[in-house]
Design a protein with these regions (language model features):
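Pyridoxal 5′-phosphate
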Residues: 1-158
Length: 158
């Protein structure tokens, strides 16, 4: 179990310094202070375990999933489905098929707004986002509301 997984499943407080060690970029100092990275809506820093897993995949297993009968494709498919199952267990999904991997939060929000929203939001409906939302979670809902005659509401944060 990685330090991050251990921290996320533990009932004790985060050991922030231990977690920071998994992210080499966070060892950098900026203007004499420890680097703090909070722009996770744009991109998220990866812990070493993820970097190592990606390096292994791209150098040893790189192949299309669900697209081939050759060994590399079968191995990639197995790894992909195993990851889907583990994520599903971690978030208590009813079944692994509920887990959809996308490139990032922006793509995910667009998929929900354009897929679910176009089918279920109509004239007079209200879509609510919080005042804290990143731009990428506002624009798709603005566009959807304009197209469907719905109202976009912003919930204030105290």
């Amino acid at each position: 179990m990685s330090v991050l997984e251990e921290s996320l499943t533990s009932t004790v407080a985060f050991d922030v310094e231990r977690i920071r060690r998994d992210f080499p970029v966070l060892q950098e100092r900026v203007r004499g202070k420890e680097l703090v990275y909070l722009d996770n809506a744009a991109t998220t820093q990866k812990p070493l375990t993820v970097a190592y897993a990606l390096q292994h995949y791209y150098t040893n297993e790189n192949a299309n999933i669900h697209r081939g009968v050759h060994l590399l494709s079968q191995q990639a498919t197995f790894s992909y489905e195993r990851a889907r199952g583990r994520v599903g267990q971690f978030i208590n999904a009813a079944e692994p098929g509920e887990i959809v991997f996308l490139r990032g939060a922006t793509e995910a929000v667009n998929l929900v707004a354009h897929g679910y929203g176009r089918q279920h939001v109509g004239p007079g409906d209200e879509v609510i986002v919080s005042q804290m939302e990143h731009h990428s979670n506002i624009v798709p809902w603005q566009v959807l509301c304009e197209e469907k005659g719905a109202t976009l509401r912003v919930a204030p944060i105290n």
